[in-house]
């Protein structure tokens, strides 16, 4: 459910997306606690290969009492824009990277006051340059003071992940192979 708010802001209901079995909840809680230890005080986390898993990890931090900003920074796909059927008019990460001098109101509120979202936005050509990519650090810095945790769904190439304090690679069980996972880590 999407509700239009003042000045073209949107509010989304995340309840259906974050529904998990008890076993899933337990797994995400354990993962969250391990990530906190591994990040060692860092607050910006990238997750590759699984946008919905990234969303659930972000929500797990919310369940632990943190204020979280989820950023759909996987410019090559619009999983969440498509899921919420928001169309192509919503500004997001891609818009900032293309025109960082313009001030956009990118935050999308959810029905949980501790959980906000920034969507991908519109990238007509599907490509960001190295200069635009380097703006991601500035983008992260703009929001890191306002939240306890930033969780980014990163592209599979890890171009965005390199600006984060840590990266999680989430494989589907059917595609996981130890050698391919090691090679992917080396590429990142």
Report each predicted region and the residues it spans.
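Glycine-rich phosphate-binding P-loop
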Residues: 45-57
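Conserved catalytic-core segment of NTP-binding enzymes
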Residues: 2-3, 64, 129-188
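Short, Asp-centered acidic motifs that coordinate Mg2+ and/or phosphate
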Residues: 44, 115-117, 149, 166
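P-loop/Walker-type NTP enzyme "switch/lid" segment
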Residues: 6, 10-40, 48-51, 66-145
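Aromatic pocket-lining residues of Rossmann-like dinucleotide-binding sites
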Residues: 61
């Amino acid at each position: 459910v999407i509700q239009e708010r003042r000045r073209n802001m949107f509010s989304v209901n995340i309840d259906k997306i974050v529904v998990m079995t008890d076993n899933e909840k337990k797994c995400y809680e354990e993962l969250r606690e391990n990530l906190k230890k591994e990040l060692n005080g860092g607050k910006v986390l990238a997750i590759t290969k699984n946008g919905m898993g990234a969303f659930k990890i972000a929500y797990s931090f919310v369940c632990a009492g943190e204020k979280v900003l989820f950023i759909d920074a996987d410019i090559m796909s619009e999983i969440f824009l498509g899921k919420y059927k928001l169309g192509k008019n919503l500004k997001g990460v891609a818009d900032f990277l293309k025109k960082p001098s313009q001030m956009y109101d990118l935050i999308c509120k959810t029905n949980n006051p501790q959980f906000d979202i920034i969507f991908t936005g519109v990238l007509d050509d599907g490509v960001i340059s190295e200069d635009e990519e380097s703006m991601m650090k500035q983008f992260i810095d703009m929001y890191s003071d306002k939240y306890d945790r930033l969780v980014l769904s990163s592209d599979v190439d890890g171009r965005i992940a390199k600006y984060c304090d840590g990266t999680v690679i989430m494989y589907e069980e059917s595609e996981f192979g130890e050698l391919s996972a090691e090679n992917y880590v080396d590429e990142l």
